[in-house]
């Protein structure tokens, strides 16, 4: 029981540190959609990722371009299936993300310049990256 309480305390302290870091930059980490339009989608990326919409778009593009090439299949008479990403399946500690395909999934590497910590760490040096704990 004591370790559970200690873990909650650590989690809360970590959230305050990340929030303070984001507040000190004075920037909105969510940002605008890459096409310049306002977008109401909220992503669960950490505050040290500068533009959540652009970041999600870049991951989706990497997913779409990964091999084997995506096959557009008609799921029913109204929809087609394309590859997807899930913002909860981005691992900032290991610098990977999950690309969801129609019949299989693949784990891909994040770009080397991806922020992976509140102190300007990037995926260039994975050993310095810290895990993101959403909703802690």
Curated annotation (Swiss-Prot):
Residues 117-136 are annotated as: CD4-binding. This is Salivary protein 15 Iric-2. Its main location: secreted. Glycans are attached at residue 105. One of its GO terms (cellular component) is extracellular region. It comes from Ixodes ricinus (Common tick). Interacts with host CD4. Interacts with host DC-SIGN (CD209). Interacts with Borrelia outer surface protein C (OspC). It is found in: Secreted. InterPro entries: Salp15. Salivary tick protein that downregulates host immune system by binding to both dendritic cells, and CD4(+) T cells. Specifically binds to the CD4 coreceptor on T cells. This interaction prevents the activation of the Src kinase, Lck, and its downstream substrate Zap-70, and results in deficient activation of PLCgamma1, the repression of calcium fluxes triggered by T-cell antigen receptor (TCR) ligation, and a subsequent reduction in interleukin-2 production. Expressed in salivary glands. Detected in fed adult female. Keywords: Glycoprotein, Secreted, Signal. Induction: By feeding. By the presence of Borrelia burgdorferi.
């Amino acid at each position: 029981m004591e370790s559970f309480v200690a873990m909650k305390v650590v989690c809360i302290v970590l959230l305050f540190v990340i929030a303070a870091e984001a507040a000190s930059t004075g920037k909105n980490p969510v940002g605008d959609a890459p096409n310049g339009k306002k977008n109401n989608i909220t992503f669960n990326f950490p505050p040290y990722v500068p533009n959540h919409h652009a970041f999600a778009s870049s991951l989706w593009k990497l997913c779409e371009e990964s091999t084997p090439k995506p096959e557009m299949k008609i799921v029913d008479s109204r929809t087609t299936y394309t590859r997807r990403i899930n913002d909860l399946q981005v691992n900032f500690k290991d610098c990977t993300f999950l690309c969801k395909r129609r019949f299989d999934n693949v784990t891909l590497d994040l770009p080397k310049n991806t922020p992976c910590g509140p102190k300007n760490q990037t995926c260039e040096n994975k050993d310095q990256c810290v895990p993101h704990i959403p909703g802690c």
